[in-house]
Amino acid sequence: GMVDTLMLSSVSDQAVGAVGTANTYIGVFIIMFGVISSGMVAVMSQNIGAGKPGIAYQARQLGLVFNALTGILISVVLAVFSGGILRAVSIAPALLESAETYLKIVGGASFLNALIPIFSSYLRVFGYTKHSLIGTVVGNVINIILNSVFLFVFNWGVMGVAAATVFSKVVNLIIVAAMGAVLIKAKQSPERAQPRKILAQIVKIGFPSAFETALYNVAMTFIVCFMNHMDTDGMNVTARSYAMQIANFSYCVGAALAQANAIMTGWRIGAKKYEECDRGTRKAVIYGLVTATCFSVTFAMTGRFIVQDRKSTRLNSSHL
């Protein structure tokens, strides 16, 4: 998202606003993926800590099937009804065409957003965190290259950025899926449990976490809807898009620490090392708070250098 925002900012601020708006509504629709993904990580890590990698593999398979089916359904909905969704939330007329193009292409491939976390989490819970990172880095590098070609050579604008995003996600998915198949041999472990029992555990753990995310995304949806009514050129939504992408850097620090701590906590719970869970979580909170604060202060002071339009610059600085 940050790459797309920075590269589109050289084309027009309205393109940034259109993509930011489309991504907001894509985020609302893919909340259901989080129910399985977050619950699956907890179940897998606990069983790995308990010495039952075979059950962890079962949890991965269940998560894969559920998210694949849900992802295909959501992809069809977003591809077919993208224009209707944007008109229903009264998107600024100046942003409608670009936002619809992006939502149709990237939203139509949202099943990739459902599958990538399954395979990436599978690598992480077994300790292959660097390998998961490789897939992400390669995908981002390809995204940057294709964005450059589509934007500055073919002049495809938002459509080019959307196509580059989808292709980079396909590459990311192939890499993490292949690495998981080669590096992890949990399938060969004899431990097995009732699939219904495992799925119940996944949903029980994942639903509260996904519901928390859902409330946040719904709030963001209403905010974007209100901002769309504030002007006809979409400048307020554009400023928000810049601010959110910049602020995501500090968010990523907390998210990374949270993911690492969740996996390690699962290992310790499985191994019945409960006191270590508390100590590890306290350390993660302190590290995350200090680092995120440093990022937040830095971006609040430097955010005005990214935006071209003066009005958008003032709005962006106030958002940050």
Residue ranges and their predicted role:
Residues L73-K104, C294-R314:
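Short membrane-interface helical motifs at transmembrane helix boundaries
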Residues T165, I174-Y216:
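Interhelical loop/hinge segments that connect adjacent transmembrane helices in multipass membrane
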Residues K130, N140-L173, G303-Q308:
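Membrane-interface helix-loop junctions in multi-pass transport and translocation proteins
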Residues V16-V76, N113-S132, V224, V237-G303:
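Small-residue-rich hydrophobic transmembrane alpha-helices
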Residues G27, N67, V106, S132, ...:
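Residue-level signature of transmembrane alpha-helical cores of multipass secondary-active transporters
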Residues L315-L320:
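Single conserved hydrophobic/aromatic residue that forms the stacking wall/gate
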